[in-house]
Amino acid sequence: MNIAEQMKDVLKEEIKAAVLKAGLAEESQIPNVVLETPKDKTHGDYSTNMAMQLARVAKKAPRQIAEEIVAHFDKGKASIEKLDIAGPGFINFYMNNQYLTKLIPSVLEAGEAYGETNIGNGERVQVEFVSANPTGDLHLGHARGAAVGDSLCNVLSKAGYDVSREYYINDAGNQINNLALSVEVRYFEALGLEKPMPEDGYRGEDIIAIGKRLAEEYGDRFVNEEESERLAFFREYGLKYELEKLRKDLENFRVPFDVWYSETSLYQNGKIDKALEALREKGHVYEEDGATWFRSTTFGDDKDRVLIKKDGTYTYLLPDIAYHKDKLDRGFDKLINVWGADHHGYIPRMKAAIEALGYEKGTLEVEIIQLVHLYKNGEKMKMSKRTGKAVTMRDLIEEVGLDAVRYFFAMRSADTHMDFDLDLAVSTSNENPVYYAQYAHARICSMLRQGEEQGLKPAADLDFSHIQSEKEYDLLKTIGGFPEAVAEAAEKRIPHRVTNYIYDLASALHSFYNAEKVIDPENEEKSRARLALMKATQITLNNALQLIGVSAPEKM
C-alpha cells in the first residue's frame, strides 16, 4: 500500500473513531466511510458525507452530527491541519502539507510500480476488443476501440486484475467466402483475365495486392483448377495475409493480444453443438415454424431469437453464444467486450445467453465505442486526401503520429461521439493535450539532467522540510492522487480518467515550474529536495502515459 492510500485509510479510521467517541452510533451501525476529492481546492483535500449517512441512526440533523464528529476528531493522528463543515453537513478535511512530503521517497522507491492497487484482487478478466473482420484495413472505429481496449487492459492490470486480451477472428462467416471470391477476381486481373467482382466483394488496395502476389508466386496455376479447390486455397491465403497485416498494424499501434481465437475452431471442436445442448437442457430452446429459437425474453430481451434458421443454417447468435460459453469454460470471472456502436442492439441477447447458461447477470460487460469524425481546417473530413478513400488507422497515424492518436482516443468517454481535430493533434502548443503532457515530461528530464551535471542527484533519504511552497504541495497532492485515479478508471471501466489525471499532473508541474526555481546554487539541500520532487513527478507521469500507450520523451 502506498503512502497516499495509507493517509486515506488512517483518515477513514479516525472518522469512525470520532463517531464512536461522540456516541453517534454503534460500530456495527457505521457505514463505509466515503471520501471524495473536492473539485474546488478551497473545500479541502477530502470531503465526507458521513453526517448525512448517520442521520437516521443518530436521529439528529446532519449538521449537528457533523459538528459532533469534528469536536471528537483527532487531527494529529490523521495528519489533518484543519476541518470545516459545509452545506447540510459535509465535512471537509485539509491535510497537513508537510506530511505530504513522505510521498516523495515512497514514489522514488516504488518506481514503475507506483500507482498499483489491488482492488482487482487477482480476479480473472477477459477483455475482447477490436475483433475486426480480416477482410481489409482497420478503420477509425477499430482504432478507437483498440486504443480504449488496450488502455482499459493496462488500467485493470495496474489495479490488480488478472487480465487476458483476446481478438476474436471472424473466419467462418460469409465474409470469408467473399474474401476468397474477391481475391480470385484480383488474381485473374493480375494475369490479364477478366472475372466479375461479386456485388458485396471487397475492393480495397490490399485485395489487389493479394491478387498480384498470388500471380507472382504461382503464375496461372489456379486458372484451370477446380473452382472449389481454387477458392479454398484463396480463402486460406487471403485470410493469412489479412491477419498478418492486422497483427502488424496493431503491434505498431502498441496493442498486444494474448489470444487470437478462431471462430472456425468452434465448429471444428463441436463447441457450437455443446452450447446449443446446454441451453436445451436448461429449457431455454424451442422449435417453431421449422426454426430453432432461444427463449431470450425470459432474461429481459425484447423478443426471442432464432438460433437455427429453417434451412438449417446458423444465425450469428449461436456461434457467438458458443464463443462466450467457451470463454467462461476457460475460468474467467468477468468478460468485458469492447464493441462498435452498431452492436448496441446485440447486447441484451448476449447478456440473456450468459444468464441462460447459468452465470450471474453481470458476468458480461459491454463497452460501446462511438463514432469518430475527423476535422481539418475546421471542416469535416470524410476521405483521405492521399488515397481518395475512407481514412484508415494507418492513414491517421501517418497524418498526426502514433502518440497523438493513442492520447486523443483515450481522452474522451468511449460511449460519446468524438470529433478528432487533426490540426490540434499536430500543434506544438499548450492547447494540444498530448504535447502539453509530453512537454511536461521532457521539461522534468531536462531539470534532472541539469541537476546531474551539477552533481545534484535526487534521493529518497533527503531532508524534505525544504518543500514548503503552495505549488510544491499542489504537485504532491496531484502525485498522491494517481493510485486513486487508476482504481477509479479500473472500477468504472473508464480509461479516460487516467488521461484527465495526466492533464492535471502536467498542469501542476507547469504551474510549479513557472513559479519556482528548481536548482538554487545558494541552497544545495533545497535543490536536491526539489529534484527529488521532480523525479517523483517524472515517475508518476511516465507510469500514467504508459497506461494509455503514449511515449514519455526525455527531449522535445
Swiss-Prot record:
Q: Which organism is it from?
A: Bacillus subtilis (strain 168)
Family the entry assigns = Belongs to the class-I aminoacyl-tRNA synthetase family.
Q: Name one GO biological process term.
A: arginyl-tRNA aminoacylation
Q: What's the protein here called?
A: Arginine--tRNA ligase
Determine the domain of life of the protein's source. Answer: Bacteria
Keywords for this protein: Aminoacyl-tRNA synthetase, ATP-binding, Cytoplasm, Ligase, Nucleotide-binding, Protein biosynthesis
State the EC number(s). 6.1.1.19
Q: Which SUPFAM superfamilies match?
A: Anticodon-binding domain of a subclass of class I aminoacyl-tRNA synthetases (SSF47323), Arginyl-tRNA synthetase (ArgRS), N-terminal 'additional' domain (SSF55190), Nucleotidylyl transferase (SSF52374)
Q: Top enzyme class of this protein?
A: ligase
Subunit structure, as described in the record? Monomer.
Q: Where is this motif: 'HIGH' region?
A: 132-142
